[in-house]
Amino acid sequence: MAIKHLFTSESVSEGHPDKIADQISDAVLDAIFEQDPKARVACETYVKTGMVMVGGEITTSAWVDIEEITRQTVREIGYVHSDMGFDANSCAVLNTIGKQSPDINQGVDKADPKEQGAGDQGIMFGYATNETEVLMPAPITYAHRLMQRQAAVRKNGTLPWLRPDAKSQVTFQYDQGKIVGIDAVVLSTQHSDSISTADLREAVMEEIIKPVLPAEWLSKETKYFINPTGRFVIGGPMGDCGLTGRKIIVDTYGGAARHGGGAFSGKDPSKVDRSAAYAARYVAKNIVAAGMADRCEIQLSYAIGVADPTSIMVETFGTEKVSQEIIIEAVRQFFDLRPYGLQEMLNLLQPIYKKTAAYGHFGREEFPWEATDKAALLRDFAGLK
């Protein structure tokens, strides 16, 4: 490991066009799951000026009002006036949803639910590190917290000239793998025409950055780039088109761990792209919480229609406190990583997904894959005190 190095991660707000798309896709999934938890859902969304298109493959007994779900989601994000470049009440909503292919269905559905096959082939990674209290890398954790703070002060009226679209980026300094400070902070936020650049920069510093970033990591050397172009009035879907599944690094570990390439939002848990990535995080987090390693990355792989993973890999980057063999044996013994098993283990057949679609899927204790309920078992198994 390099003695001293910098590492950077970024996040985007709930009003970023790609995140609008993710939230609509997951809002549709949740609405269907409220009526039919066994539904098959693959919902993709595209947003651009004045228009939302919702498509994909859905097989369900439920009936949901796609148009109203779409408008309500955009409304909650805060795009409610044409002055912002997008209006939930007047945008067009196009629905192009079809049904899941019976060829896929026959590989997934089995007479014995425990033998449910994976919905596709693929590789998934999960990661945990003890550098933050939520066992996530610090750069992505604090990038998300900046975006959550931006939304909070926008919605509660503290900074009424803020608009929904925003991005953050935080560069941490490490020395021998330990955080020693924050080198740079980038925060760009959409705003109304009424605020000057100087006033915006001061307000963002005082109301967003300072309340979020720990003072001990900031110094006179820390660099701040607040709306560095000087103007960000045109934003949201008017500035860029948005698509479901285009923020997969923001959704996961900010680049600090590997990624299998599969996106999450709009997919029911039969899609291992989503459910197995959650399970891999759960496994990695419990290994770190148990004190078996300081850092842990899990890779899983699957074949379409086959229940058992085709491979399980554990990487602890030389930080393990017990042998790799013990860790791998513990994973096999205490975690059921078949599609049905991990759905049951993590209680995934419930409408909890819209909340995941902004500010990251990991490091947020309200989600079942963030539980560390297996840590004591693992500690005992490994003989750790």
Curated annotation (Swiss-Prot):
Residues 100-110 are annotated as: Flexible loop. Its cofactor is Mg(2+); K(+). Binds 2 divalent ions per subunit. Binds 1 potassium ion per subunit. It is found in: Cytoplasm. Pfam families: S-AdoMet_synt_C (PF02773), S-AdoMet_synt_M (PF02772), S-AdoMet_synt_N (PF00438). K(+) binds at E44. This is S-adenosylmethionine synthase. It comes from Vibrio cholerae serotype O1 (strain ATCC 39315 / El Tor Inaba N16961). The gene is metK.
